[in-house]
A protein has these predicted regions:
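Short, well-structured alpha-helical segments in soluble
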Residues: 28-39
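Accessory alpha-helical/coil subdomains and C-terminal extensions
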Residues: 35, 46-48, 54-66, 70, ...
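Short acidic/polar active-site loop segments enriched in Thr and Asp
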Residues: 42
C-alpha cells in the first residue's frame, strides 16, 4: 500500500510506509484488516527487514488489543544488511555479499589498468551494520587482493588516520581501493 491522500492497499508490490502508532492513526490498521477480511485472508506473511518486522509487530499487537484471533501475522526476516536480531545469516545477505565481493574484484581490475595514481572509495549499503562492507574482502576468494582498507560503521572513523593510511598506501602502489560502510561517522 502507499500513503497518499488516504491509504490505498495494493494486491502486490512493495511498501516503504511505516505504520503510525494505532493511537494516532487506527484507520491504517482498520483498512488493513478490512482488506484482509474482504479477500478472506487469514494469514498475513510479511517478508522484509527491520521496518517490515516493525510493521508485523505493530499489526500483531493491534490485532491482539482488538481481540481479533482469526487473522495471523507472521514476519519472515530478509535483509541484505544481515542485521536482524536472532538470525545468523538473513536471507538476502548471502547473494548480496557475493555480489559485493565480485564487484570489488572487478573494480580492482579496472583500477589497476592505469598508470596514474588513483584512490577509489566505494560506499557500501548496510545502514548501521557493516556486514556487506566486510564482505568486500570476498574479492580475495577469486585471486584479487580485495580492498586496501575496509571501514566499518561499528568502528570509530578518524579522517586523520584515514588520510595518513591512504597517503602511505599510495606511496607503495598506484591504486588504492577503499570500502566504507554507509553508516560510518566521523569521530
Amino acid at each position: 500500500y502507499r500513503r497518499q491522500r488516504q491509504m490505498c492497499i495494493r494486491d502486490s508490490g512493495s511498501c516503504r510506509v511505516k505504520l503510525k502508532d494505532p493511537a494516532v492513526c487506527a484507520d491504517e490498521y482498520e483498512t488493513i484488516i478490512s482488506f484482509l477480511r474482504k479477500y478472506n485472508i487469514d494469514c498475513f506473511i510479511y517478508i522484509g527487514g527491520n521496518d517490515s518486522m516493525d510493521t508485523v509487530d505493530k499489526l500483531s499487537k493491534y490485532l491482539n488489543t482488538k481481540g481479533i484471533t482469526d487473522i495471523t501475522v507472521v514476519g519472515a526476516p530478509k535483509t541484505i544488511d544481515n542485521d536482524l536480531c536472532g538470525t545468523d545469516h538473513c536471507p538476502g545477505f548471502g547473494s548480496a555479499a557475493k555480489y559485493i565481493g565480485t564487484t570489488f574484484a572487478e573494480l580492482e581490475r579496472d583500477c589497476y589498468v592505469y598508470a596514474t595514481k588513483a584512490v577509489t572509495i566505494v560506499e557500501v549499503m548496510g545502514r548501521d551494520a557493516g556486514w556487506l562492507t566486510a564482505a568486500s574482502c570476498l574479492a580475495r576468494a577469486n585471486g584479487a587482493k580485495g580492498p586496501d582498507f575496509i571501514y566499518l560503521c561499528e568502528v570509530p572513523f578518524s579522517i586523520d588516520t584515514f588520510l595518513k593510511d591512504v597517503k602511505a598506501k599510495l606511496e607503495e602502489q598506484d591504486a588504492v581501493i577503499i570500502a566504507v560502510s554507509e553508516g560510518c561517522l566521523l569521530y
